[in-house]
């Protein structure tokens, strides 16, 4: 590809022309070209370095999909550092001034990196296609190790195809035919050979990727329709099952006699925290006895909602809380009780990690304002009885204070068996998988679209030059090949636009919040989703 543009740029009717430095451009043109290309090169380098650092510091991005994007970022970084700047220098000076060895090394690096980008896009397309069409058989084999092998093969094939031929062709034929002031691939001096490489390196891969993406799109749309039909049939019985389901879900470790309406109105309170608060309801607990000082609960189950697809991708781990029970007596070990024996309604306030700095949660015995939809989460907590005679309410019920337990926790509580509607859970899981598949397909479509837009003009000129050698001006050759480089600039932008986790990680890195722990904790408590 590149050799043909160099050939047209530095020869006239096949005869080499020696140019003086910068004689082909005016001063303002040199300044403009140098400034624009320097900015594009800088954006390319910064964008792809951000992709690599984001992958390193944020474990949420360490998915199989993103291993391929990391490989693509490596190829784009090579182009941003070496290819863009050396090619711009070559254009401005009108000749190659670094010698034949540097020329061959640069061409080998440039072609290997460019071809590796194409191969990585092919691998991503096949990975998405098999993930959609063979979810049971392919996904079991879809591991980081397998992804690493595929990435290694993509780079190895690119290296074998280009590097030996570029570096060793002159030794195979016995002489170097490229002039000293030019830089081009010796075996691409014939337009027909250049045409063949364009077909193999661009048109065939683009055709394959387009076909695969069309099939991915059709399969995704089909699954969306099937899921909509499934949700429609499930909604028929949803209203009938709602009340029993609520009663079954609202279980925890405390129980006391149901208060009257007046008592509930009197005792109603709400969760409060340093940042956010939500209403809480409950059937207050009968104290285990004046002498009981503390009791360890097996689980405290709470319910909230799945309002959107983003919530399904939030981390499943929830804060572990400590309940301080205010009553008479002092703190000391007491008896245990389990969820099967007791019943109470709780609603969890969504809190960020910073809420732990000033914990002040109050759980009231009120029983009003339940949430509309449900997401079951389990907590371990500690119940501590403190001397406070004023805290006791009617019917022996008490106010409790929720405080964070010290980390780490050895074992997370299980929430199995809490949902009484398995078909609803199955539908919800299918929706989560479908949302992730659609996000991955969107990222792939953006990358493919950018690749086709930036690489097509140059490869069209290659086809034209095969039949009409002088029909393509030198300036268009330069612009066309530079546009291929711009694809490396656009790719990180596509990742950020299509993936919220990438976008937020980029922002935090640019704001110099680069420490791994801070980045992961911030993204965790903001509920960012993983990359498909």
Swiss-Prot record:
Glycans are attached at residue 8. Residues 1-29, 88-104, 170-191, 465-478 are extracellular. PROSITE patterns: G_PROTEIN_RECEP_F1_1, G_PROTEIN_RECEP_F1_2. It is a multi-pass membrane protein. Residues 262-294 are annotated as: Disordered. Its main location: membrane. This is Muscarinic acetylcholine receptor M5. It comes from Homo sapiens. The gene is CHRM5.
